Amino acid sequence: MANLSKIKRDQMIAFLESLKESHSDDASIQAFNEIENHIRDKKYGLVWEEHSEEVDDLLKENIPILTADPERRLCKDASLPWNFIIEGDNLQALYLLGKTHKGKVDCIYIDPPYNTGARDWKYNNDYVDGSDVYRHSKWLSMMKNRLLLAKNLLNPADSVLICTIDEKEYLRLGCLLEEVFPDARIQMVSVAIHSSGVARSEFSRTDEYYFFVFVGASAPVAVPLGLEWQSDGTKRQQDVRWESMLRSGNNGRRIDRPNLFFPALFEESTGEFLGFDKPVPLEVSGADYIPPLGAIAILPYASDGSEACWRISAKKALELKSIGAFDWSPIKDGKTTLKYLKPGELEKIEKGEYQVVGHKENGAMIVSAENYSPKWVPGTQWHVPTHQAGGAGGSSLIKTVLKTKRFDFPKSLYAVRDTLRFMTANKPNAIIVDFFAGSGTTFHAVNLLNAEDGGNRKCIMVTNNEVSVNEAKELKEKGYKPCDDEWEKYGIAKFVTWPRTVCCIEGHDVDGDSLKGTYTTSLGTEIKCSDGFKANVKFFKCGWTPRKPEDYLLSNALCLHIKEMIELQNAIEVDNVKNVLILNKEDFRRTILNADVRPQIERVWVNQNIIFSTEELKALKEIGYKYIPREFFGQELREAAE
């Protein structure tokens, strides 16, 4: 079958080649080459009109930098790692995270704009609404640029990107994820978030979708789950499973495993177990086997009366009997059921998940699973009451903490907690990034998860400081404009994300009153909201510095922001006591040569451009030090010829 599109492309390219022969000047050749490149562009899969952003233009002439906000810092426990909220365009932040966290992130969770047509997100400082004919192209351009940078952060051996979306863009998002992550395994989960449905002219929307992009060996972890995960209200099997010794199904015939067709012998009068006899020769029928005098022989027969085989050997069965892991039912009409505990069940006993509460007369263990919570991975449809966006973990929680409705459509705390739990239950020190942070649910969920299992997961959230449409209108009517202090005060980073984070860690609302109620843990227990969480968090703001300054050295400008990069990369606070940054000789004298500070120093970072004497280097080596990583701004300095 002819590829008509390819034939047409080849014809156009051949025509361009002929034009090149008659128009050989540089301008014409350059124009022809651009036309040819466009003709050869991808013509299949997800194709859209790519749009540029103002931030792209800013990146060409400027370098993103971070500056700590000294008024927004919360230390609850100095022994714990630090978390970070970064205010700024997420393209800026991802550029910097690519320098501090390349290949180090375990989980990225994002809840991007759903592009519903409402005025809920901006492209180049303008709201994108339903009347914009390029709204899908703008959304895809915005997402692709960020996903490409985010991909660079993920641990290639084992990590996951989770992206939530609804029906407006899920088809395009799925194609985009396949394009950006061609080697990943991608799965979509449906999550019920509105049991009553969102009213519309079509079917009411009750759910949204979570894309899981599994990188490397990443996979969801089987974890204990409560009954709310059972849509039909029934329990998952929690009883101790004694496996029947009779094999069924594939390879279950005697002819398949002739060595496993052997008799189990019992005392005829008492039913006492006597042991096993040798396998019956294949040419001898089981019916012709004659047991020892006074014994009953139990041979493996299928339910249809045909000769079958056992699952395990006589030797293995006796080994299990010696530890109480082999059992049988009372003999009735010359029949009994042999059973044993498989390795998985024995492991649960060893771990204390099952309890041995006694032994039967035949020596078999009596095992209780009363306190055991089975571990499993759910299916792709989640109907969990706590995942409701308008419930106690969603908008109601936001209003309780912030006292007013400062944010529309927050995710349920428990939906995010459960999502992160499936991917990081086996990673208590995971690094989690959310670069569409919004109301700050992700960090809240990380704190709750850490409180549940004692983990030290770290979270980096990125959000801009946009005000809502209504707030912008009110502020403009009062004469305020973007960048005014009064305007910035009501931006989402400062008005929602930060205060929610502080309140939830400290256990009070924005008025200072203790939070009422409890958090429900994954296993159904409760944690008082007023107890808060043990966590530390810093607030950074993205800024710019020119790539080629005229009146000063770029290296001097960048040195002012190295501290934040080191803190972000290492989840620490550079306090110049415990963690020390040496940018010049004065820093060296104030710390390394300070008899009061030196004994407290644990880690040191040094500017490579400082020339130290032999004695000074010796003092540094005694403590141990690292040079400021070249990957921070080495490329930018080379471009500036520094």
Summary of predicted features, one role per range:
Residues 216-399:
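Active-site-adjacent helix-turn-beta-strand microarchitecture at beta-sheet edges
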Residues 41-57, 87-116, 120-121, 334-384:
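Carboxylate/His-rich catalytic cores and anion/metal-binding grooves
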Residues 103-122, 177, 432-447:
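Conserved proline-anchored active-site loop of SAM-dependent methyltransferases
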